[in-house]
Design a protein with these regions (language model features):
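Low-complexity, highly charged intrinsically disordered N-terminal segments
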Residues: 96-180
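Conserved small/polar residues in nucleotide/adenosyl-binding loops
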Residues: 318-319
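A short acidic-Thr-Gly-centered motif at the start of a beta-strand
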Residues: 23-35, 180-190, 203-213
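N-terminal low-complexity, Ser/Thr- and acidic-residue-enriched intrinsically disordered segments
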Residues: 17-124, 293-297, 305
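Extended charged low-complexity segments that act as oligomerization/scaffolding linkers
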Residues: 70-97, 229-285
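Short secondary-structure boundary/capping segments
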Residues: 54-60, 207-211, 232-243
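Active-site environment of divalent metal-dependent phosphoester hydrolases
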Residues: 47-48, 199-202, 224-229
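Divalent metal-coordination and catalytic microenvironments
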Residues: 43, 196, 223
Length: 320
């Protein structure tokens, strides 16, 4: 009876033999493709610049694909520029525009090279899977450019017109950003984050923002991450703990710029209570300089001590 129930459920998706056979053929063929690349990162600890570079460069895989695709056709300098364009397309396009190098020739060359790289990195996936990863606004154009044989005399003009029209209607820069995103997406099929995203590093919030835009990621939370979750729910001990950790490592940027936490009441309180105490044991460990909110280390030490004492009190209250 249970088998009959399962068969009835399957019949909704596969109403006849042809439908079932078609899917079996497709799944069996997929088993013959190489497995998608999986990346494991552990203990990020808020080091956003290193993490984002490794993620966007696929730990050097993209540079390797450029070398495999173009060999000695392009110079090493052009390889580096193409790689950086894929990693940080918006930033590189702005730099090229400022240098007055954003010409039609540059756009055509960039689009052509990016399409070749995209073909290379998409070769291990089915067309269906590649389509699912394509940015919606350019999915039709990218699909045509990837799978049209531009060496076919009947399609050469068509291929060229696709690229020319992108430039004529002034969406080449948006297209470049989109196909660069697709390339990065195809070089990493699954992303696994193990351990702490938060800790003593400067900007864990930027790491989270980057992960929110990633297509397939799973996270094993660490103890520092749990503390931030507790703080977000309003637990006073957790709030004090995350503030203490950030202040102890000079992490004012993540608090004030990243999450908009107003530290002025704490600084005024600490200045008043510890005005005659240098709090030298609580001086912050300056691993990274604050970009947006530079705070005098002496004041930071007083704030650090104040929040530490408040944390001990908050923890004691939770056990009463």
């Amino acid at each position: 009876m249970r088998d009959l129930a399962y068969l009835k459920l399957l019949s909704r998706e596969y109403p006849n033999i042809r439908a079932a056979a078609s899917d079996i053929i497709n799944l069996q063929a997929i088993c013959g493709l190489p497995k998608g690349t999986e990346y494991f990162f552990s203990d990020l600890h808020g080091e956003h610049e290193a993490f984002i570079y490794l993620l966007r460069s696929s730990s050097g895989i993209i540079r390797e694909k450029i070398r495999e695709t173009f060999g000695h056709i392009i110079s090493e300098e052009d390889e580096v520029r193409l790689a950086n364009l894929i990693y940080y397309p918006e930033k590189m396009i702005n730099q090229i525009k400022q240098a007055n190098e954003y010409t039609e020739d540059w756009q055509k060359t960039a689009v052509y090279r990016l399409v070749q790289i995209c073909r290379e990195v998409s070769s291990k996936y089915t067309r269906s899977k590649v389509r699912k990863k394509m940015p919606k606004e350019f999915s039709g154009v990218i699909d045509e450019l990837l799978y049209v044989d531009n060496t076919d005399d009947n399609k050469t003009e068509y291929y060229s017109e696709l690229i020319n029209t992108l430039i004529d209607v002034q969406v080449a820069d948006s297209f470049i950003v989109a196909i660069c995103s697709l390339i990065r997406s195809l070089t990493i099929d699954n992303l696994h984050i193990l351990g702490d995203i938060f800790d003593r590093g400067p900007r864990p919030d930027i790491i989270l923002e980057e992960l929110m835009h990633f297509h397939d990621v799973d996270i094993q939370w660490g103890n520092h991450d749990i503390s931030w979750m507790g703080a977000a729910t309003g637990n006073r001990a957790c709030i004090c703990n995350v503030l203490r950790m950030a202040l102890g490592y000079n992490g004012f940027d993540v608090l004030e710029d990243g999450y908009g936490i107003n530290l002025r009441p704490l600084s005024m309180f600490a200045e008043r209570v510890y005005r005659d105490d240098p709090c030298t044991c609580f001086l912050p460990q300056i691993l990274d300089k604050n970009i947006y909110d530079a705070v005098d280390p002496k004041l930071a030490a007083k704030m650090h001590k104040a929040i530490a004492v408040l944390q001990y009190k908050a923890v004691s209250y939770t056990h009463l």
